[in-house]
Amino acid sequence: AEADLLVHDLSPDAADLVGLHEDDLAQRHPSLVTVSVTPFGRSGPYSKWCAEDLQLIHGGGWGWMTPGCSDEIDLPPLKPAGQQAGFQIGFAAATIALGALDRSLCTGEGEHLDLAGMAYISSMLEAGFISWSYLNEIPGRAGTRILNPWRIFEVADGRIFIVCVEDDQWARLKEVMGSPEWAQM
């Protein structure tokens, strides 16, 4: 059997037990790209710890920021709907895996990528780092109030979540709303 890419979510001990340690794989299959997706990475003080979506969301800081789409900043830390940590970490794993695979197919050299889920979730804290760097705005529980629509809005029949970060998205949203005068710049 042959493969160019291996992605797994086994704990470091489980991966070693079934022969998927990155050093052994690199020696046997030098062009293979491997991606380990674990809660805390394959090394470090928490590498053997388990975690689920809820722990990753709150450990990564996202839970504290959850009222960011609401005006009710006194709400307790919340969990986003669904399995958001898993979705986001999976998307990151796919992205880095395909990038490394493309490089490997060009060079013939494999590599191992270690994706720590909590570190990735921490990197997503809204636009906090950007807002602090460029606007000198310190993010708080109310989220980062950036210049584009990115929140839950009250509407006539309930609520709607709108994210328009690109000019063409804003243009289409204005069109859907009937091009109100207040939305013209």
Predicted segments, located by residue:
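N-terminal helix-loop segment corresponding to the beta1-alpha1 unit
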Residues: 1-109, 135
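Aromatic-enriched alpha-helical interface/lid elements that frame and gate functional surfaces
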Residues: 148-185
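Short hydrophobic/aromatic-rich motifs at helix boundaries and adjacent loops
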Residues: 66-74, 122, 141-146
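A short glycine-threonine-serine/GTX helix/turn-capping micro-motif
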Residues: 77-88, 110-112, 140-144, 148-150, ...
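Generic alpha-helical structural context detector
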Residues: 57, 64, 95, 99, ...
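Glycine-rich beta-alpha junction loops
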Residues: 39-41, 54, 117-122, 157-159, ...
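Substrate-binding/catalytic subdomain of NAD(P)-dependent oxidoreductase enzymes
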Residues: 101-140
